[in-house]
């Protein structure tokens, strides 16, 4: 069953552009992982201060395999000057997925 994992990242005021830059530089670090379907980095606009990294996976097993291997390796040695002050992981199963046609009236 497809799953969605959302990393809610707490970012201090003014540090958002640096977080976005770091994600842009590493956007391809996960794309070839088995079971990875895609991700979006969401910038807060109103009513929320956290950034959300929304990832889509074929299964929880695929996510766990990435999180316990390549994700750890990708972050090794990158602890200097962290941008985030905290993060929490939200986990969901996809029970309905409706795609749009992209057409306008």
UniProtKB/Swiss-Prot annotation:
Keyword Metal-binding: yes
GO biological process per UniProt: heme catabolic process
GO cellular component: peptidoglycan-based cell wall; plasma membrane
GO function term, MF aspect, one: heme binding
UniProt KW Oxidoreductase keyword: yes
Domain ABM: 3-92
Misc: MhuD has the ability to bind 2 heme molecules per monomer but only the monoheme-protein complex is active.
Name of the protein in its database record: Heme oxygenase (mycobilin-producing)
Species in which this protein is naturally found: Mycobacterium tuberculosis (strain ATCC 25618 / H37Rv)
Gene: mhuD
